[in-house]
């Protein structure tokens, strides 16, 4: 299964489980839930090399450092 299909199915299941009361600001909720483990996994993959992790993630090292602090990684 590709990542796009996984996300689509997961969001559909989440909305189904919520029934008639879907959460406000679903986009922000999903981004918060996904971004922290994404960054942690890429940092682990790079052995903690923030420059390489930032390159893989397509962000600046400064942005990566801010996110690491935000999520206490």
For every predicted segment, state its role:
Residues 1-2, 9-73:
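Bacterial C-terminal helix-turn-helix
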């Amino acid at each position: 299964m590709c990542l796009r299909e996984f996300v689509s199915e997961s969001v559909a299941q989440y909305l189904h489980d919520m029934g008639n009361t879907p959460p406000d600001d679903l986009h922000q909720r999903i981004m918060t839930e996904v971004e922290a483990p994404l960054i942690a996994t890429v940092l682990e993959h790079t052995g903690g090399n923030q420059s390489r992790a930032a390159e893989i993630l397509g962000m600046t090292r400064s942005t990566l450092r801010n996110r690491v602090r935000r999520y206490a990684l």
